[in-house]
Amino acid sequence: MKRAVVVFSGGQDSTTCLAQALHQYDEVHCVTFDYGQRHRAEIDVARSLALKLGVRAHKMLDVTLLNELAVSSLTRDSIPVPDYEPNADGIPNTFVPGRNILFLTLAAIYAYQVKAEAVITGVCETDFSGYPDCRDEFVKALNRAVNLGMAKDIRFETPLMWLDKAETWALADYWGKLNLVREETLTCYNGIKGDGCGHCAACNLRANGLNHYLADKAAVVTAMKQKTGLQ
């Protein structure tokens, strides 16, 4: 039996990954992290979506210690979430230091316990957000370290790594979940479900990707299939 663990936040990317995993694996587990994030609605959205998609095993993990250590606009109400700036340099204040290091490591420990062969995460390098822990180089390096530390061969899969946002929308549509992703996921840095606030970087990236996909579906689907190997 093929088993996978999906790192699941209830956002666009992880929901798209979950939709695909449910078609490609016999048994899919989700793990969602409570790290004291600014918008607690994320956890409720993740729980609701997992139930709606038929996930039988959904693990909620308390990692609120991260909130004490990692200062970010996503962990502190006192730090404002910036509006989207197309040419902004440096790491944005929405970056939570160590988040993906911790999430992937804990997901791998969970995968070890449930005998899953893969940990799936929706990180992406193509539409680079400025987050160093979304890079392919980082994921592969951590994967090697975790496998050495547990004497296990667990794959870290990144289905969206080389897709842009338009292609990610195409992938959600391929699995019949475009409307679900558009209406019921929470990607917005200001905690607004669906199309979000329309001002933050996450909303801008999401909206531009959707507009591109809807305007040029055939070309975007072709590019998505070439990158993913789907037929």
From Swiss-Prot:
Residue positions annotated to bind ATP are F8, S9, G10, G11, Q12, D13, S14, T15, T16, C17, L18
Q: NCBIfam families from the entry?
A: 7-cyano-7-deazaguanine synthase QueC, PRK11106.1
> Which terms in the Gene Ontology molecular function aspect does this entry carry?
ATP binding; ligase activity, forming carbon-nitrogen bonds; zinc ion binding
Q: Which cofactor does it need?
A: Zn(2+)
What pathway does this protein act in? Purine metabolism; 7-cyano-7-deazaguanine biosynthesis
Query: What are its E.C. numbers?
Result: 6.3.4.20
Reactions that this protein is recorded to catalyse: 7-carboxy-7-deazaguanine + NH4(+) + ATP = 7-cyano-7-deazaguanine + ADP + phosphate + H2O + H(+)
- Any Pfam family matching the protein: QueC
Describe how the cofactor binds: Binds 1 zinc ion per subunit.
Binding-site residues, Zn(2+): C188, C197, C200, C203
Tell me the GO BP annotations in alphabetical order.
queuosine biosynthetic process
**Gene3D superfamilies xref list:** HUPs
- What InterPro entries has UniProt attached to this entry? QueC, Rossmann-like_a/b/a_fold
Q: What class of enzyme is it?
A: ligase
Query: What is the role of this chain?
Result: Catalyzes the ATP-dependent conversion of 7-carboxy-7-deazaguanine (CDG) to 7-cyano-7-deazaguanine (preQ(0)).
Q: Could you tell me the keywords of this UniProt record? A: ATP-binding, Ligase, Metal-binding, Nucleotide-binding, Queuosine biosynthesis, Zinc
Q: Which gene encodes it?
A: queC
Q: What is this protein called?
A: 7-cyano-7-deazaguanine synthase
Q: Write out the similarity annotation.
A: Belongs to the QueC family.
Q: Which organism is it from?
A: Salmonella arizonae (strain ATCC BAA-731 / CDC346-86 / RSK2980)
